């Protein structure tokens, strides 16, 4: 009898579990994966090239659109690289605000990951709960920047503006009656810090709810335990970072190992896995949400007691105040020049990396002394993770490929750039 050849299957890019535009060419022996070949580039938008034609400030909104689930963390690495080259000091209050919003972004990302991952595996309920909490955090974004997703809130030298004293209120509509609106607005009567503090008090209970639904769930464990195992040595060799590396038992977190902003003043722990499988990575990310909540609490407490500027006083970089612009012609000219021509950055190069929710997100900038970068290179955390997909999926079933894609927490905006 003739030998049966392996079967080739196209997975995605229209597949609901492909998380955007992933195309996988799977080589199968029956239902067992022999090879997984990811095809990328379907969401390529030439961000690195576009940044060469725009001033440093005009490229900030492009950063939001890279990993469009962790918006402010992308901006953070970019503005840190600019600040390194300009050698400017960021006010302490702005550093605390950045750290607080980095952690809000981390929770936003992990909630999206948890909901989507559980949905891919077949658990519908967690998805709905996770999005309930995401709404509150999106409102924090909206309060400081006016946008629920693409905030462009971090600026070279600080942040766009200080935290507001009021929260946006829900208005009565056709789909919600007055009673529902008053319930929604109940915790929005104070400042943004009051709202965030209220959220941090409620959030640990929500995380317990997710764990009740999943952690000891027999089906969840059958789908995740022992799937996509990566040894610590292989994880480091393949360039894994973030939860993908910590899930394999390597204690590496830039917030502790190479502290930036005020992370060295924060009290938090790094969760680390032992087996390097999908289940350990799930546990690591769930614990990360609890640790992020701890950091946010510390930031809220400090910000309540310490006022101060949120933008550097270096006026080559910082725009004039809105009040000054309305009364002073020089301020108006300064504002116009800053946002049209931009500031010139000294010749040199800088690399800045942050502990992004998905791993190490780095921005490498080269300046030739002009008002726009000569070259920008983005180090996307998801890129090496996707590269390791072939090794992680080998020998598993087709259904497990969905679990492995889910555990990698892949977003194509940053991979294709």
Swiss-Prot record:
PROSITE patterns, per the entry: COMPLEX1_49K
Organism of provenance: Janthinobacterium sp. (strain Marseille) (Minibacterium massiliensis)
Recorded superkingdom: Bacteria
Keywords linked to the UniProt accession: Cell inner membrane, Cell membrane, Membrane, NAD, Quinone, Translocase, Transport, Ubiquinone
Pfam families the UniProt entry points to: Complex1_49kDa
Family in the record: Belongs to the complex I 49 kDa subunit family.
Subunit and partners: NDH-1 is composed of 14 different subunits. Subunits NuoB, C, D, E, F, and G constitute the peripheral sector of the complex.
Subcellular location: Cell inner membrane
UniProt name for this protein: NADH-quinone oxidoreductase subunit D
Keyword hit for Aminoacyl-tRNA synthetase: no
Membrane topology: Peripheral membrane protein
Reaction(s) catalysed by this chain's protein: a quinone + NADH + 5 H(+)(in) = a quinol + NAD(+) + 4 H(+)(out)
GO molecular function terms noted in the UniProt entry: NAD binding; NADH:ubiquinone reductase (non-electrogenic) activity; quinone binding
HAMAP family: NDH1_NuoD
NCBIfam families assigned to the protein according to its UniProt record, in alphabetical order: NuoD, PRK06075.1
GO cellular component, one term: plasma membrane
Function field: NDH-1 shuttles electrons from NADH, via FMN and iron-sulfur (Fe-S) centers, to quinones in the respiratory chain. The immediate electron acceptor for the enzyme in this species is believed to be ubiquinone. Couples the redox reaction to proton translocation (for every two electrons transferred, four hydrogen ions are translocated across the cytoplasmic membrane), and thus conserves the redox energy in a proton gradient.
Primary localisation category: membrane
EC number(s) from the headed UniProt entry: 7.1.1.-
